[in-house]
Amino acid sequence: MNKVPLTEKGAQQLREELQELKTVVRPKVVTAIAEARAHGDLKENAEYHAAREEQGFVEGRIRDLEHQLAHAQIIDVSKLQKDGRVVFGVTVDLVNIETDEEASYQIVGDLEANIKENKISINSPIARALIGKREGDEIQVQAPSGIILYEIAAIGYQ
């Protein structure tokens, strides 16, 4: 199976969520199941069934996080070679050539992508157009509304 790229920061966030689920959430669910079981008949015990359902979700998320971390290629962005090219993990400041609108994106793996945090997947059309380019280069991105032209204003290696 191919390794999925993940920044060190993204891997740390997944580890923290996994730790929280294992040490805080899972024990609470087990306690809720035990309390509901003590109420008697399990066939008509809504609290018991709700707690069991929550347990299924928690265990599924734990398995999912463990799988993601086991199959991740963790990349420390601070140790990347700073040769002026756009690579995985960098933050790129763009200027729309037609509208002068500015945007800033960090190129991350699929697991970390979150447009609200300006993190775009390395597999997105914008990131694919940016990889290997340098500051001052122009790129074309195919958007639903047509082709958009951007200039790379800055590249940051945080």
Curated annotation (Swiss-Prot):
It holds the Pfam family GreA_GreB. Transmembrane segments: none annotated. GO terms for molecular function: DNA binding; RNA polymerase binding. Residues 1-26 form a coiled coil. This is Transcription elongation factor GreA. Belongs to the GreA/GreB family. It comes from the Bacteria. Necessary for efficient RNA polymerase transcription elongation past template-encoded arresting sites. The arresting sites in DNA have the property of trapping a certain fraction of elongating RNA polymerases that pass through, resulting in locked ternary complexes. Cleavage of the nascent transcript by cleavage factors such as GreA or GreB allows the resumption of elongation from the new 3'terminus. GreA releases sequences of 2 to 3 nucleotides. One of its GO terms (biological process) is regulation of DNA-templated transcription elongation. InterPro entries: GreA/GreB_C_sf (IPR036953), TF_GreA/GreB_CS (IPR018151), Tscrpt_elong_fac_GreA (IPR006359), Tscrpt_elong_fac_GreA/B (IPR028624), Tscrpt_elong_fac_GreA/B_C (IPR001437), Tscrpt_elong_fac_GreA/B_fam (IPR023459), Tscrpt_elong_fac_GreA/B_N (IPR022691), Tscrpt_elong_fac_GreA/B_N_sf (IPR036805). Keywords: Coiled coil, DNA-binding, Transcription, Transcription regulation. PROSITE patterns: GREAB_1 (PS00829), GREAB_2 (PS00830).
